[in-house]
Amino acid sequence: MITRGLMLALACSFLVLAGCRSAPVMNVVDAPVGVSRSAQQVEQAIVSAGNSLGWQMRPMGPGRIEGTLLLRDHRAVVDIDYSPRTYSIRYKDSSNLHYDGGTIHKNYNGWIENLDRAIRNRLT
């Protein structure tokens, strides 16, 4: 009886710990640029911020940049839409981050927070 209870407790603990590894996907939507900037200045700030953190930033046309972060065997890809007034960072693709339609490995959100912070710092 004790063995069965112990097995059940271990199984529940494993499920709880496994669930802690994922979190809802974080997107940054319409973050204000702040002071008046041109679209080119906003693009330069985004590219500079991403590059400083190891992101590969690739302009995809007016108002859009694709950012790719490669860490060990993980890959995160985001679309960054911007204007002179706002910018948005949205999930696009990933590998080895256990993306499941709305949740992803918890480290992803930290990478997005760092990117957002670096962009904001360059725009102030």
Regions found by a protein language model. Name each.
Residues 21-124:
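Ser/Thr-rich, low-complexity intrinsically disordered terminal regions
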Residues 16-19:
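C-terminal motif of bacterial Sec signal peptides marking the signal peptidase cleavage site
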Residues 8-14:
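Sec-dependent N-terminal signal peptides
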Residues 1-7:
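Bacterial N-terminal signal peptides that target proteins for export
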Residues 7-8, 38:
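Generic detector of short alpha-helix boundary/capping microenvironments
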